[in-house]
From Swiss-Prot:
Top-level taxon in the UniProt lineage: Bacteria
Protein name per Swiss-Prot or TrEMBL: Outer membrane usher protein AfaC
One cellular component (GO) term of this entry: cell outer membrane
Keyword field: Cell outer membrane, Membrane, Plasmid, Signal, Transmembrane, Transmembrane beta strand, Transport
Listed GO biological process terms: pilus assembly
Pfam families, per the entry: PapC_C (PF13953), PapC_N (PF13954), Usher (PF00577)
Record's function text: Involved in the export and assembly of AFA-III afimbrial adhesin subunits across the outer membrane.
Gene encoding the protein: afaC
Family named by the database record: Belongs to the fimbrial export usher family.
PANTHER family (alphabetical): F1 CAPSULE-ANCHORING PROTEIN, OUTER MEMBRANE USHER PROTEIN
Gene Ontology MF, one: fimbrial usher porin activity
Membrane topology: Multi-pass membrane protein
Residues annotated as signal peptide: 1-28
Compartment(s): Cell outer membrane
Amino acid sequence: MRDTSSGRMRTGVTGLALAVMVACVMFRAESGIARTYSFDAAMLKGGGKGVDLTLFEEGGQLPGIYPVDIILNGSRVDSQEMAFHAERDAEGRPYLKTCLTREMLARYGVRIEEYPALFRASGEGRGASVAEEACADLTAIPQATESYQFAAQQLVLGIPQVAPSAAEGDWPEALWDDGIPAFLLNWQANAGRSEYRGYGKRVTDSYWVSLQPGINIGPWRVRNLTTWNRSSGQSGKWESSYIRAERGLNGIKSRLTLGEDYTPSDIFDSVPFRGAMMSSDESMVPYNLREFAPVVRGIARTQARIEVRQNGYLIQSQTVAPGAFALTDLPVTGSGSDLQVTVLESDGTAQVFTVPFTTPAIALREGYLKYNVTAGQYRSSDDAVEHTSLGQVTAMYGLPWGLTVYGGLQGADDYQSAALGLGWSLGRLGAVSLDTTHSRGQQKGHDYETGDTWRIRYNKSFELTGTSFTAASYQYSSDGYHTLPDVLDTWRDDRYAYRHTENRSRRTTLSLSQSLGQWGYVGLNGSRDEYRDRPHRDYFGASYSTSWNNISLSVNWSRNRNSGGYYGGWSRTEDSVSMWMSVPLGRWFGGADNDISTTAQMQRSTGQDTRYEAGLNGRAFDRRLYWDVREQMVPGSESHADTSRLNLTWYGTYGELTGMYSYSSTMRQLNAGMSGSMVAHSEGVTFGQRTGDTVALIAAPGVSGASVGGWPGVRTDFRGYTLAGYASPYQENVLTLDPTTFPEDAEVPQTDSRVVPTKGAVVRAGFRTRVGGRALVSLARQDGTPLPFGAVVTVEGERGQAAGSAGVVGDRGEVYLSGLKESGKLKAQWGENSLCHADYRLPEEKGPAGIFLTRTVCM
């Protein structure tokens, strides 16, 4: 915000009186009362010589750059600084007008493609590139209005043809940003030492490195995961988990993948492959058009990042505010296995829990097509399995009356299968689907077998009762039915032992989550797997979580009945119960930057001693250092398993550092780790904390040390750049800078930037900056008289940063300017065609309030 206090102190009483009168004129003009006012310039000091007050007399305002709220059809849609220029209406009255770009109108939901003349006039004859950035002519839209309310600092738009916002998350394709060309690298490194002192001293060292390089060129994304590990007595080993190239096909809402990936699991079980895949990309589609996805609920103690993994792969990362949260837009990917949820609190703590997951009923909106085409080789995690060629085609289509038809074909050497199903949306009663799959396959050493499987699935959310999600499924498989992995995994190198595959006949699952309002959430889930060659396997789970007055509590119970041996040689039932509580102590010991909490935890499992743990954690150094001290006790344990542990984490501008020391009577452990990310781009190389697949490059040139988004340690580097990760693709992401962390000589007129990245993009989130001194400049003409009151002064010759600072001259020829270099040029304009130029140089010492005071002559 501009500090003009010094300028006002030097303005005479007459100047203040004039300002009041001008404000009154503006108010009356905004009220729609057309009157003509006349000011006596002689009332100003110096007799008002050379002063042109015509603009004020006509109820106009000075052109310039103003911060405005943009109001569209009564709703605020944006806030930013905009440049306004003076124009006159049909009756000759002055008014201020700004430039509405194609990108802005698309962001606000205007159907710009329906009005070809909206940008044609302003871009005509100036080249295509200029036309893209041309200003909109709203007269091309019938009944559209535009009005700048100067007193309220609002740009009010009335546009009848705004796209409806019924499809939540449907951001126009015109806003999707493929980002900039870049090289990315996420990295982690850990080293540990364990010293065992039970029966003879033994020391074990371990080292682990993870590298995730990537390249972005236009819409193409190349990604790889490479790891290296070494432990005592073993040599280091490099391993590449996957490498693939992919791109979005925006026009058909699809994605093309070349390399190593997994097929979707909506019809057939997911299959790892190496080859090519083209499929629908649901992240490009509004939430209400997508296939059903599970809901993950929980409670965050602080602003937290929620990570959801399936089969070890990160499928969702989202930032939530403190309190209860619900993730409703999870992609249905992977193998249909359970979801592992991690709540990463901003204080460094983490909650981890599991959400049982069953592929839900298939019910698509009318007219929506979802498909997948895959060709390549089978890619087993077992190196002994042969790389058999395979292909898969699946399709789902939404029909009228709430029906969905779907099916697919799957084939490989020694295996073929076909599936057909029908889904039905029952409206308020939920959705149900029924399908069957016929398979024919030959396992190694066996004859061909054929079989069928039938599956019925149901899911529903009951909003009135607060039941957030219910899912039930039942699957029956006949003898001789096999999935593709069941068959291909048997074709192995003869040097390796044959691996038995599960011969499951039935599978039943149930999951329920119930909201209790202010009392929290309760969840129930269970499953039963029945086999032909072994006893059944059962799982039951229950959980409860709540938060009251920042005190968090969670209780979990689970029961597993596992059978051993392929013919039921043994079975075991294992119960596990845990309770966790966190109580903040900030009101007594902490503060805004060093929240202190105490935690207590109890864990008990069948056949194991009960474990109790008490801890104390907090933050220091502007929340960048997280510390955690814990003591674990096992009463009655003969192994003396009581353990003390200290964890430290430093969240830095260029990455994170971690350290852990653990001590007990029989063992000592020491671990240290580093992690971070790097993006090489056309403007240099930027380092930061670890990021996800989609990254925002924060660019605020010259503003170093600015905090981004409130996350600990995420600050701009010495050049004003940093990385903000885990952006949501095809959705609007708002990135903010904290103005209280700016350097003294830096200003950022607009502290938030909005981007809509495509999946895997590195998007540039640029901020206009003014870096330099703040000064009160006294401007005089060659004859020594001050510049006329109302003259507009701007800084010339600024490139690469924000538009130069601008100010209005007072009645003594003084103007307040910011973002000034040590020396430069000024331009002053007044009246119709009057202007002059001046050179300035800032003095060595600052005046009051850190503002330079200087004089110069305008010629």
